[in-house]
Regions:
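Bacterial lipoprotein signal-peptidase II cleavage site
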Residues: 20-40
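Flexible loop/turn connectors
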Residues: 263-315
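Beta-alpha junction/loop-to-helix N-cap segments that form part of ligand/metal-binding clefts
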Residues: 79-141, 232-259
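Hydrophobic alpha-helical segments within soluble ligand-binding/sensing domains
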Residues: 38-39, 133-175, 274-295
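Extracytoplasmic "Venus flytrap"
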Residues: 33, 39-71, 79-89, 183, ...
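Sec-dependent N-terminal signal peptides of Gram-positive bacterial secreted proteins and lipoproteins
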Residues: 3-24
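An alpha-beta-alpha
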Residues: 45, 63, 151-198, 296, ...
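Pocket-lining segment of extracytoplasmic ligand-binding domains
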Residues: 185-254, 260
């Protein structure tokens, strides 16, 4: 009897311990609910930013602010890494995120998005500061949702309105140069859309592409010698080299219409601007829906900026003698 009683007591103790262990389990690490994220109610989000410049910095800041507000300061942690525009570094960063089994990856710009897509099919990936997800991910029959572990926000401003802006501010333009980095697929996509608008209006154009920052000076010099105006789409390489572009275009009196505010503030006359901070914040809201509310990322359509604003660069407009009509906001000097 005593032996049976002792055995029963030991068995009860073992079962109680096992149940307690199950109750404190951190789950499978998928990040599908706040209770099992990171084993302590905390989500870990890996952020890979392609390079440093104002637009991408603002998107990262907006994303983090949204996550902190929605999840709570103590419930989300960030591992923020900058790839400095290098493919090898980008791969290393993303692979480290995958090895660490982060709950979600924010891919800030096209290169991190493409790299993350190749690295994992399980961890949710949100892109931001990406123009066209279809071309970036090689999806031919693009419908707005990827059908896989990827979604995000697009920074594409209406191309037709950008072309209208160029014709409004530079009505005498007969030949327009399209300046972008040939290594950035999103830039090529925008260039093709812009060219179609120019063709429809009977305006001739010529492409000027740089493979990297080392070629920007020479191709920009060629552009100002052959064109009346220049269009630069959202392009990370160009955004990091606006001083070089401005030092050539401004003395040549060739106005630049820019695809985003960061480029415009450095070398442009005007832009149809989105707020990259707001775009990042919007992406943070998507992260909350995925991690905290269990929304299926595969069926989430890529979102665009809620609003766009006409903005101009007062200093460059004055230098070129361009009068800005009503309806434009001045870009504040830094």
């Amino acid at each position: 009897m005593k032996l049976k009683k002792v055995t029963a007591i030991l068995l009860t103790a073992v079962m109680t311990a096992a149940l307690a262990a199950c109750g404190s389990s951190s789950g499978d690490g998928s990040g599908s609910s706040g209770d099992d994220a990171g084993g302590s109610g905390t989500y870990t989000i890996g952020i890979c930013q392609q390079m440093e410049h104002a637009a991408l910095d603002a998107a990262t800041e907006g994303f983090q602010d949204a996550c902190r507000e929605l999840f709570g300061e103590d419930n989300v942690e960030f591992d923020v890494q900058n790839a400095q525009g290098e493919q090898t570094m980008c791969s290393t960063i993303v692979n480290n995120f995958v090895s660490s089994d982060v709950d979600l990856i924010l891919a800030n710009a096209t290169l991190p998005l493409q790299t993350a897509a190749q690295a994992t099919s399980d961890i949710p990936i949100l892109g931001t500061s990406v123009t066209d997800y279809g071309s970036a991910l090689g999806i031919d029959d693009w419908t707005g949702a990827t059908g896989v572990n990827i979604s995000g926000t697009s920074d594409l401003a209406p191309i037709e309105e950008q072309e209208d802006m160029l014709l409004e501010l530079v009505p005498e333009a007969q030949t327009v140069g399209i300046l972008y980095c040939s290594a950035e697929s999103n830039s090529k996509y925008q260039a093709e859309l812009f060219e179609a608008e120019l063709e429809a209006d009977g305006i001739s154009y010529k492409e000027y592409t740089a493979a990297d920052s080392n070629e920007i000076q020479s191709v920009t010099q060629n552009a100002v010698e052959e064109c009346d105006a220049i269009y630069i789409p959202t392009d990370n390489t160009m955004a990091s080299n606006t001083q070089i572009i401005n030092n050539i275009c401004l003395p040549a009196k060739v106005p630049v219409i820019a695809g985003e505010e960061g480029i415009c503030s450095g070398c442009g006359v005007a832009t149809l601007s989105i707020s990259y901070y707001d775009l990042g914040y919007q992406t943070g809201e998507m992260a909350y829906k995925i991690l905290a509310e269990g929304e299926d990322i595969a069926s989430m359509e890529v979102e665009t900026a809620a609003q766009v604003t006409k903005k101009y660069n007062p200093a460059i407009c004055e230098e070129l003698g361009i009068t800005i009509p009503e309806g434009y906001e001045a870009i504040e000097a830094e």
